[in-house]
Amino acid sequence: MANWFGGVKEFKASVLYFILKQRYKIILHSNPNEPSDLVFGNPLQQARKILSYQNTKRVFYTGENEAPNFNLFDYAIGFDELDFNDRYLRMPLYYAYLHYKAMLVNDTTSPYKLKALYTLKKPSHKFKENHPNLCAVVNGETDPLKRGFASFVASNPNAPIRNAFYDALNSIEPVAGGGSVRNTLGYKVKNKNEFLSQYKFNLCFENSQGYGYVTEKILDAYFSHTIPIYWGSPSVAKDFNPKSFVNVHDFKNFDEAIDYIRYLHTHQNAYLDMLYENPLNSVNEKAGFYQDLSFEKILDFFKNILENDTIYHNPSALYRDLNEPLVSVDDLRRDHERLLSKATPLLELSQNTSFKIYRKAYQKSLPLLRAIRRWIKK
């Protein structure tokens, strides 16, 4: 692994490791000088690490809103709807997070049922103890209509559209904030799913917009038996049943979306119809994931990688000194703020009346100045 968020421990907990170990013996290391069948990497702020692996098949994997560069990587797994033959697989982050949910509900007290593959591990007995409200609402022991209005959990404040929608919705009806952004509780919730299950809606906006960019946020809402209010991927209805959530992209503006949310909130039958819709779209009356995404499809993708000896990446493309630090998003933001601070006096000067008069006089004198320069050159 060139770089993986959380290192070896997190990779071993990932769905990719879980799937691959069903067929392959996996030996992990991060030494570019040792032989490897493939190397995982992510260019976000760490592109130089992958460049050390010159003669190894590179696999791009991301949980962020970024597209793969096929000059730098041989294969890629991402959010975008790309058709690049057998070199690309679309596997949004929500699908990866289904694995964590499955591991969580391998429990004798869980209201959710698991496929046999996940029941091989000895089950726990703590789910209901840790999720009493979630279990009660899923099992029909409490009325889903008699819950709070809406919940919101976010840790990244740099999401202006998400923040603006929260403020607009919160001005109509109080929205409980359990994260570090727009917190209303006085503390950050530790059990997100249990918290979400106590409300009728969950505001699950992505931090940025991108076609196909669907993360775990909408999955958390479904898992918590609450209706997602979603914004992020304009094509999200390909991934999830549009009758099962509020898609803010369907409305002209925030006001229209909020009016619809208020309608659901005040009309019991409409709310319950949406709540009990299958989250997945159906093809031939069978619910399934978009583009038939499955463990088998993912295994076939890696089977092709491992059996194909071709290395596609261009060693000369995007090459840079491995010791040269890359520019990060924070660096760019600081540079922008520094340049803006230097430009501010000039901007203020440009609004000054005297400055405008001198500038206008200078512009009128330009033809004469050019003529003088030509005469001097002669």
Label each region the model flagged:
Residues 174-182, 204, 232:
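His/Asp/Glu-enriched short active-site or ligand-binding loop at hydrolase and phosphoryl-transfer sites
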